[in-house]
Curated annotation (Swiss-Prot):
Binding site for Zn(2+): 879, 881, 890-891
Cellular location(s): Cell inner membrane; Cytoplasm
Species for this entry: Ruegeria sp. (strain TM1040)
Name of this chain's protein: Protein translocase subunit SecA
Keyword terms, alphabetized: ATP-binding, Cell inner membrane, Cell membrane, Cytoplasm, Membrane, Metal-binding, Nucleotide-binding, Protein transport, Translocase, Translocation, Transport, Zinc
Chain residue ranges for the region called Disordered: 560-579, 848-884
Disulfide-bonded cysteines: none
SMART domains per record: SecA_DEAD (SM00957), SecA_PP_bind (SM00958)
Cofactor annotation: Zn(2+)
Binding annotation for ATP: 89, 107-111, 502
Positions of transmembrane segments: none
Gene Ontology molecular function terms on file: ATP binding; metal ion binding; protein-exporting ATPase activity
């Protein structure tokens, strides 16, 4: 019998069905234009782009241009790649243009889909960013799709790490730019540390199309991107504390597997206090609860987490003497990514590797806040519907499930639940053997390196040939994936095989042709390809007859999306396939999150050894457990975002102010206002409002004016004059400070002083923002405890961070004013001393490099050691003294 909800959906259709239906007239319009665009010459396609560009700039809406633009891209792709986009691909592209997430299954051609909205939105001249999860995909997609964009008369760029600056700048100026989410985020942070606007890469954030959007905007959402600098080396402290952890008993700590937390018990705290006193890390009479002990307690907690929560070969691997993290969602290594707040160092101490120094944060942003900078955002993935609520609530993105071009023929079996892990693995091996014997390719999915290697040993014992794909063997990934769909192939893979991999039945034809050419370089490539294609077609037919790719998973992940990604490797483009999950009561998800009802159901059935429970109720119960975990993780991400939003508002203010300063030719008004505000603050401190003259601290004001404004003002004498009030003293100080700064303008020249002001402003903003980030980090780490006092941690954080921000701005004004009041040109004596140092340094350089490059002959009347003969070099020219430095960093340096 149908439920009420199901019945209503059958009658009225789902919201998703209605969205699909609404695009059909648009797709019909694009299809109707096809003959017209097929008739265009290659130049005609480019001319069409120019026509559409002019119309877009003239104000015609992109929605109105969409049918012609999509028809143009379809024709360009057909000519450049030999691929004609399906109607479902046009549909996916339309939803992306509308600012949605298009959920498209594996093998449906998402890479080509992105070209349609990218082209349409690039017509405005504001640029489009296509975002991928790794550099391999960014480079591959850029190289592949640049043929389409080139045929359309558009430019394509790619962004990657360690890219030369000029190349990166050119890539950002292209119509369409492919990049990884990490590199985009880091470039944004670097841009906001640059000294001038012409060095900034990301001029605007117009439209981003995010591939594997759930991975980037949900799985990575809690991970901040951090640009950091070195802090003090404390490796000895980590090593000392690490030795304490193995001495703990189980009663000294409690592990909460649901929240991945571990805490000391009262008994553990007492033991810890004694151990720290013996180790000399706590002074006699000191307690763990003293404020001075906060740092030690923090490091002990991190060491406990490193030992009890982080497992080698699951959460990280040790490679070439370094601790390298593993992404829990993709199973890939994350070189360069480090855990913060001393946790990474604690793991290094545990593993006995070199302990890298801690870092201090220079700038940071989360992906949630970075991608919300874009005027328009959209995304593609094979699995998004389970997180539709989060996409809508946090990013304002709708999710549309785009129908497949051909119906899915894959069979998804009910889960098989065994009592023990050993019984489960035995059943998987037996099933693999049966499939292998009939030639059906098998993909065995695991959640960790350890489990993938255990399955590998079991297969070896049975004499079954197989490949293993995990973070240890990531270099062979492309080859292993290419062969995973071949006749009788058996592949064990961690979550690495779950995303961005396309397993083709019969194997990858391009790789087969390449290998055949390497083996026989003298052969005719066309003949060889025809031979390989014939063999491939025959092998593919046998694989299809055997049932297509069989995906077996060794356990369910906390997230249904990860399970669905693994399922999606099978049954691409209407191919047959089969998926099955093998579970046991010892699995993490079953043990930690399985409901009591499920436990009772299974124990009441009296399972025999090797017997499995297979029932839709079990699936439903597990999915409820997964939904519960997903809901909890969503709440955690929302909570992190609420706190990060507070910092984000401040970040936007600081970065916007910084950009304004970089863009400004004259910052004189800004620094003058700052200086006058500093004077106002000094008057308020030493001559508080509504006080009498005999209550003023005039000596304190005089000393502070000398310190902060570099003025010897006789404030004490002024205050002693008859009838002088605080306002008159303020005016005299303003006049004196204005006069001092006017003298500096005269000494340096208007342009020179403007450059100094801009430099001091930017450097001080950067330094103060760094300090502020560190303060906010500390506040964030302790504010949670306010909840025990019945105070809302978020409100406490908002209020205190705002006060800290105001204090930072006050400190910024003071520092800028103080530094500018002390700049001066170098004296003749200082210049002579500098020239002597230069001459000595040049002598050493000549001695060290007698065969130096030839230098340009000096001009007539020019004496290298006499600045009076140098004329008026520009600040950015090479210094005439021959040091090789810019003039502004050498003899033109400011004192």
């Amino acid at each position: 019998m149908l439920g009420i909800g199901t019945l209503a959906k059958k009658v009225f259709g789902t919201p998703n069905d209605r969205k699909i239906k609404a695009t059909r007239p648009l797709i019909a319009k694009i299809n109707a234009l096809e003959p017209e665009f097929e008739a265009l010459s290659d130049q005609g396609i480019k001319d069409k782009t120019e026509d559409l560009r002019k119309r877009a700039l003239a104000g015609e809406s992109l929605d109105d241009l969409l049918p012609e633009a999509f028809a143009n891209v379809r024709e360009a792709a057909r000519r450049a790649l030999g691929l004609r986009a399906f109607d479902t691909q046009l549909m996916g592209g339309t939803f992306l243009h509308q600012g949605n997430i298009s959920e498209m299954k594996t093998g449906e051609g998402k890479t080509l889909v992105a070209t349609f909205p990218a082209y349409l939105n690039a017509l405005t001249g504001k640029g489009v960013h296509v975002v991928t999860v790794n550099e391999y995909l960014a480079k591959r997609d850029s190289e592949w799709m640049s043929k389409v964009f080139g045929a359309l008369g558009m430019t394509t760029g790619v962004i990657y790490s360690n890219q030369p600056e000029a190349e990166k700048m050119a890539a950002y100026q292209c119509d369409v730019t492919y990049a990884t989410n990490n590199e985009l985020g880091f470039d944004y942070l670097r841009d906001n540390m640059k000294p001038s606007l012409d060095q900034v890469f990301q001029k605007q954030h117009n439209f981003a199309i995010v591939d594997e959007v759930d991975s980037i905007l949900i799985d990575e959402a809690r991970t901040p991107l951090i640009i950091s600098g070195p802090a003090e080396d404390r490796s000895e402290l980590y090593e000392t504390i690490d030795k304490l952890i193995p001495t703990l008993d189980e009663g000294h700590y409690e592990i909460d597997e649901k929240t991945r937390g571990v805490t000391f018990t009262d008994e553990g705290n007492e033991f810890l206090e004694e151990s720290l006193l013996k180790a000399g890390l706590l002074e006699e009479g000191a307690s763990l609860y003293d404020p001075e002990s906060t740092t030690i307690v923090h490091h002990v907690n991190q060491a406990l987490r490193a030992h009890k929560l982080f497992q080698r070969d699951k959460d990280y691997i040790v490679r070439d003497g370094n601790v390298v993290l593993i992404d829990e969602f993709t199973g890939r290594m994350m070189p360069g990514r480090r855990l913060s707040e001393g946790l990474h160092q604690a793991i290094e101490a545990k593993e006995g590797t070199d302990i890298q120094p801690e870092n201090t944060t220079l700038a940071s942003v989360t992906f949630q806040n970075y991608f919300r900078l874009y005027d328009k955002l959209s995304g593609m993935t094979g699995t998004a519907m389970t997180e539709a609520e989060e996409f809508a609530e946090i990013y304002g993105l709708g999710v549309v499930e785009v129908p497949t071009n051909r119906p899915i023929a894959r069979i998804d079996e009910d889960d098989k639940v065994y009592r023990t892990a050993n019984e489960k693995y035995a059943a998987m091996i037996a099933e693999t053997k049966l499939a292998h014997e009939k030639g059906q390719p098998v993909l065995l999915g695991t959640t960790s390196i350890e489990k993938s290697e255990l399955l590998s040993q079991l297969l070896q014992q049975e004499g079954i040939e197989h490949n293993v794909l995990n973070a240890r063997h990531h270099e062979q990934e492309a080859k292993i994936v290419a062969e995973a769909g071949r006749l009788g192939a058996v592949t064990i893979a961690t979550n690495m095989a779950g995303r961005g991999t396309d397993i083709q039945l019969g194997g990858n034809i391009d790789l087969k042709v390449m290998e055949a050419l390497e083996a026989n370089p003298d052969a005719d490539p066309a003949v060889l390809r025809a031979e390989e294609e014939a063999k491939h077609a025959e092998e593919k037919q046998k694989v299809l007859e055997a049932g297509g790719l069989y995906v077996m998973a060794s356990e369910r992940h906390e997230s249904r999306r990860i399970d669905n990604q693994l399922r999606g490797r099978s049954g691409r483009q209407g191919d047959p396939g089969r998926t099955s999950f093998y579970l046991s009561l010892e699995d993490d998800l079953m043990r930690i999150f399985g409901s009591e009802r499920l436990d009772k159901l299974l124990s009441g059935l009296g399972m025999k050894e090797g017997e499995a429970i297979i029932h839709p109720w079990v699936n439903k119960s597990l999915e409820r457990a997964q939904a519960k975990v997903e809901g909890r993780n969503f709440d955690m991400r929302k909570n992190v975002l609420k706190f990060d939003d507070v910092m984000n508002d401040q970040r936007k203010v600081v970065f916007a102010q910084r950009r304004e300063i970089m863009a400004s030719d004259d910052t004189h008004e800004i620094v003058t206002d700052m200086r006058h505000e500093v004077i106002d603050d000094l008057i308020d401190i030493y001559m508080p409002p509504k006080t009498y003259a005999d209550q003023w601290d005039t000596q304190g004001l005089q000393d502070d004016v000398r310190e902060k404004l570099n003025i010897d003002a006789p404030v004490v004498e002024w205050a002693a004059e008859e009838g002088v009030d605080d306002e008159q003293i303020r005016e005299r100080l303003v006049e004196a400070s204005d006069k001092l700064m006017a003298e500096k303008v005269e000494a340096f020249g208007q342009e020179g002083m403007s450059n100094i002001e801009k430099q001091v402003l930017l450097q001080t903003i950067d330094a103060k923002w760094r300090e502020h980030l560190l303060t906010l980090e500390h506040l964030r780490s302790v504010v949670g405890f306010r909840g025990y006092a019945q105070r809302d941690p978020l409100n406490e954080y908002k209020n205190e961070s705002f006060q800290l921000f105001e204090s930072m701005l006050d400190s910024l004004r003071e520092t800028v004013t103080q530094q500018l009041s002390r700049v001066r040109p170098l004296s003749e004596e200082e210049q002579r001393e500098m020239m002597m140092q230069m001459a000595a340094r040049q002598g050493m350089q000549r001695a060290a490099a007698p065969a130096a490059e030839p230098v340009e002959a000096p001009k007539e009347g020019f004496v290298e050691d006499d600045p009076s003969t140098w004329g008026n070099p520009s600040r950015n020219d090479k210094c005439p003294c021959g040091s090789g430095k810019k003039f502004k960093h050498c003899h033109g340096r400011l004192g």
